[in-house]
Structures are given as C-alpha cells and as structure tokens.
C-alpha cells in the first residue's frame, strides 16, 4: 500500500472551518472543506494522530478508491476491483454504510447490499471463505459515498463516532454532543484562557459535557485516549508499532498535563437528578481533581475561584423544552444576564443557544457571534465581555416579553377635571390612605397593596395599587340602590383616582366583583396578555390586571406567603390549589428543599412556571396539573410544610363532581394531613365569609386559628377577608 493516503474527516455541520484548522495542526495536508466534512492527504502516523487527537471530527475515513458509476453494475464492479485481501480476513466481519443517491441507486439499503456483495464475492472467489456481516463491532467498516456520479469508497479508521469519548454514559434530556461542545469551547477562546490559568464556570451544566471537554483541553488530554477498540484494530493494513508510538506520546502528554495544578472548573445545575450522573461522568473521565459539580440555581450563580482569577462563563441554556414556554425561557436569559453583570465582572461569557433572539434580553452586548448547527437545529454562539461599557442601558425594558407592561413615567393631564364634592371626598381618602400605607409598603419592600376597601359606604370599591397601575374592583350594589346613582358614583371615583394618585387614566383597570358561579371566577375576561412584574418580600411575581377577574396575586395572603418564606428552609413544601404558585416562589426563596404545586388549571400552572422562572427557579419545583382531591388520594409522599387555599366553590370538566369548601374541607384536610410529616405544619385558609371549621378536626389535630396574624395593615379594616388555621399532627 502507499505510504500516503487521502483522508476524509466528517463533522457536524458548521464545524468544517474549525476542523480544517485543527487537522492542519495535526499534520493533514492539502486540506479542502466540504459540507460537514474536510479532506486532505497524510501518512499513516498522521491518520492515527487524527483519530486519537481530533476533538471535532465524527469519523476519520481512509479513501481506498474513487470511481465513476452510472448504474448498480458499475458500483459492484468498482468495489469488486479492490484487493480486499489486503484489508479484511476472508473469515472476518464487516459492516457497510452507504450514503447518497443517483446513478440508479435510489435506496441506500440497496446500495449497501451491492457493496457488501462485491466484497464478499471477491474474498470468496479468492480464498474460498466469505466474511460475515457484523453491524455493531465489525473488523472493518466500509463507507461508500455517492456524490453526483462519483463513488468514494473508504475504510472507517475511527470505528464508533469519535464524539463518543466513553465518559458520558449518563446524560440529560437534551445532550450536546461532545465534539460540538469542544467546538463551542474553542470558538469561545477557552484554549487561550486555559493557557493563561483562567477559570471556567457553567451555570446550567447538565451532566457536565462542557466541563469535561474544557478540562481535557486544559490538561492536554487527547479526547479519545481511553478508547480501546478502533476501526483499524482488526484492519490488515494496521501498523501496530506506529500506533503505539502515537498512543504513547498522547499518554505522556496527558500524564504531564494532569501533573500540573488543576484549573478551577466548576458546574452548577438546578435539577438534582443530574448532579450524580454529572459527577459520575467526571470521574469516568479521570478528572475528579479538575472538575466539581454542585446543585445551584441560575439566580444564585456566583463563581468564586480560589485565586480570584477571571475566566470564561459558558452555558447552553434550554431551548424551551425544560421550561415549557418562551416567556419562561426569556426570564431565564434575563436572570443569566443579571448574574453575569452582578457576579462576573471582568469575565468572558459564551452562550450557545437555539434561540439567539433571547440573547438580546441579557442586557449585555455580544461582540462576536458564530453560526452552528446542533443536529438539524440552527444555533448561535454569542460571546460577551462582562464589562460596564458592554452593558445595555434600559435592559429591563428590553427584557419584557411581547405584551408585557413595564413601569413608565405616567403622562400628566394638562388640566385635571373638576371633581364633584363626593368625588373630592373620595380623592382625599385615597391620599390619606396613601400617606399612611405608602411608608409601610416601602419599608416592607411591597409593590402591591390594597389602598382602599369600601372605606366610604357610598363608594363600594376595592382599590389596589400595583406599582403605578391601579386595579379597581366594583362591588355589586344591592338591589335597594338606584342603578343610576351607583353608576354616577363609580364615574366620580374613576375621575378621582388618577388625580388623587397622580397616574394616567389609562393605567386604571376596572372590574366588577360579584358572586361567581362555577368556573367563571377563573375564566378569561379579556385577551390583552399584559403581564407586569412586581416585587414582594424579595421575590418577583407576574400579575395580569386585565385578562382575568383576579390578577394572579391574592394581596390579602401576603403575610401567609411571607410566613411560608420564613419557615421553608430545608423543607419539602406542598402547595394545593396553588393558582399561580406565588406561595411556592416564596418557599423556594426561603430555601425549600423541594416544592410541589398542584392545580387543575393549565393556564395558571403556565403562569406559575413563569413566576418560578422569573426568579431563576427551575424544574426541581414540580408543577402538577390535577384535581387536588384525586391527587391526594393517589399520592404517598411526605411533606414538611403544606399550604391549602381552596376556592369557595369549583367545578370543571377535568374533575369529577363539584368542590364545596364548607362541605368538603374535612375530607380535604384529612387527606392532606395524611401526607404531613411528623413535626410538619399545614396552613389552611379560605375566603368564604360564612365558613365554619368542623369541630371534629379540632379533636383529631392540633388546630390554631391564626387569622389575625395573617392580615397586614392594608387589610386590617376588613378582618373578614379570609380566615386561616395552623394544623399539626397530635
């Protein structure tokens, strides 16, 4: 055989340029790029070196022959003309892979059969024996690629694809192939940063692919050094002495690299199910001293290298599957950008994404972008320098999803209308309440509170402030009240509110509050889709003032949510009838070990998912769409802290029967208490004004009414807004 060969290296689409540069550095000459491949010329030593050292290639193919063909007979004759006794024992095993079509070959399976027949017939006619087919681990794997009438016949020197390094036996739901991860690291400048002694951190590391590939680059470890079976292992053209030379050189370089002080390489992953698989992958790669993986949310990401060195933050955020919708994904990118700006000053950052438009929501300018493909999905690698001059001013406004409202300075009317005497009295009451409650709200870090609740009988309204928006609920007037007078007073109030509070009339939202039947309480009232971000006790929550009767945040339960935040540390939290899971967000903020939230409404669970994502909390917080009673009957888990705030009345196509809180609360609480761990606490609350707790519950459990403790100053005037109890096992 010749001492010089044509080699054909395949790779993921988009890596051709990087692979060409890498292959030249490893000795490949006359390099030319093709779609998802490169080709060049090399001796056998270089071919071996490419196999063991290429971080980017999928396969290294040694071209045996190129020939023209017009039909299947030409294909057979071209393959049969090769002296296969130089490559494969007559009683050996082979596999054939065929790609392309044309020249009478429109079926790759048929093409592969013709190639196989040509090889088998050649050896049988010469040796009297024939090789057998072995698809998994053959002695020789033959490739034939048909391209515009030209057949390229090759031997696969690599065997299994080179991206399969052998360390990643456990992986997450959407893994990044190892050679693609290496390409992203190279494009991100990691070889340069590593050579300078820099650090690397991945805030969403999954099972650690970026971390292991980064450590192998930094420690000068050949990616396929540990591979035991190669495509050339049983090939008759194999030169074992030459291979041992190449392998021994790689082994020596790895030993020297691992003898150096390890770089600081850390990964953080929110999903506890991926932590141990990631650590196992690191150990299989022999990099336990270099790479550490911890459980952590994006919202708390803060790399702290031992020597305070800077480096590279690299991440492959989910493309939508893990979090469920685009809005949740947007908040994830927003959180990532916030953490980079707050905790990674002076670092470089690289975000590999299938949703590049979300990179613009991070509040940092990307100074370089590279196109990649992750399988069939077009992706972008966004590179950032985390420096103040790269920060985008006003990024909070940019980070809102389409249709989301942001705070603005309200336009002032040029000349306010004169108020009636009654309206002026109403305005004066609003201003008095604002002065009293505003100081309290600012001190408690509260954006939303009840400013007025039918304080004056003739103005039967609830007025809630949501930052610089006003949510007004009109209580239905009794039949004894003249409808015209009631309407006039409502119009007076609506005229007074903007003047009294100094906000635009366009920021006043009016709804009518009356007794609801069935599921009407939860039905959509409008379709504006305007979400607003508010703050409460250190957490961010989304409210929608227009589309539903309720806004997504029950203001009267604020003290209960704050109590849950204070008590949640290290506990398993269960939220039943969770609505938009605002209490769950508080529990996560308080350090809950895990949270589970159950509700029948997909709409509100999607909202809950956004609330969690907005705060950087992800899928360790379980959201279950189910009828609560049925879910409790089928659940066998234990919880340390349970919160139940059921509706007064509920029915749905998805549930059997009708839920009535007065009738069904005993069964509900018995089922929930069966899930309460020893020493745990269950909080039960509801808004039914005539509700009476069944006395038998007080005999079975330790029950304490805590209603007075769950009312903040803004609801002190209406101590019947809800009732609340604390229950424990006796």
Curated annotation (Swiss-Prot):
Cross-referenced SUPFAM superfamilies: S-adenosyl-L-methionine-dependent methyltransferases (SSF53335)
Region of interest called Disordered, as start-end residue ranges on this chain: 395-418
Listed PROSITE patterns: THUMP
EC identifiers of the protein: 2.1.1.173, 2.1.1.264
GO cellular component entries: cytoplasm
Domain THUMP as annotated: residue spans: 46-157
Enzyme type, top EC level: transferase
Known function: Specifically methylates the guanine in position 2445 (m2G2445) and the guanine in position 2069 (m7G2069) of 23S rRNA.
Alphabetical list of HAMAP family matching this protein: 23SrRNA_methyltr_KL
Name used for this protein in its record: Ribosomal RNA large subunit methyltransferase K/L
Annotated organism of origin: Pseudomonas putida (strain GB-1)
Recorded name of the encoding gene: rlmL
